[in-house]
Amino acid sequence: MSNLVFDIEADGLTPTKIHCIVAMDVDTKDVFTFDNTQLDEGYNMLQTATKLIGHNIIGYDIPVVERLGHIDLSDKKIVDTLVLSRLFKPTREGNHGLEGWGYRLGFKKGDYGEQEQAWEHYTPEMLEYCKRDVVLNHKVYNALKHESKGFTPT
């Protein structure tokens, strides 16, 4: 069992298909990519994980994967770095999104998706963008773990 940082790319905010899945093992730093022909392997990896980590995975990625992949991830420990970012510093300079974190950590998110209709069909560039998001999110996860050392709920 493993702890995975993961991300998906799909065809919009109310998706009808997932284009790709990328996951990183938190301990080994191994990165696993699954394009649109390998999604079942990606679903299997997510199902075998102990903990799933990602940015807005509670609000987007997990519900989309469960609905379109026909899998159940409800038994997983979930760490949503967007939720933690807002919890630890509600008035964080910049914003809580991955793009803002990328600027703060000196690891820019990338600009894929700014072109019109970028999310309609799978492209290899989309997979690379997803991979970069996962690497950035791993950095965010580590930064938030460091921040949490001084966090005391009131």
Q: What residue ranges belong to the model's regions?
A:
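Generic, well-ordered alpha-helical scaffold segments in large soluble proteins
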Residues: 64, 68, 101-104, 140-147
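Short, flexible active-site-proximal loops enriched in glycine and acidic residues
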Residues: 73-76, 109-111, 152
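Mixed-charge, glycine-rich, non-catalytic linkers/tails in nucleic-acid processing enzymes
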Residues: 116, 120-154
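Short alpha-helix plus adjacent loop in nuclease-associated cores
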Residues: 78-104, 126, 130
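A short, charged helix-loop
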Residues: 100-125
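Short helix-capping/linker segments at secondary-structure and domain boundaries
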Residues: 29, 90-94, 144-150
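Conserved RNase H-like, two-metal-ion catalytic cores of nucleic-acid enzymes
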Residues: 1-92
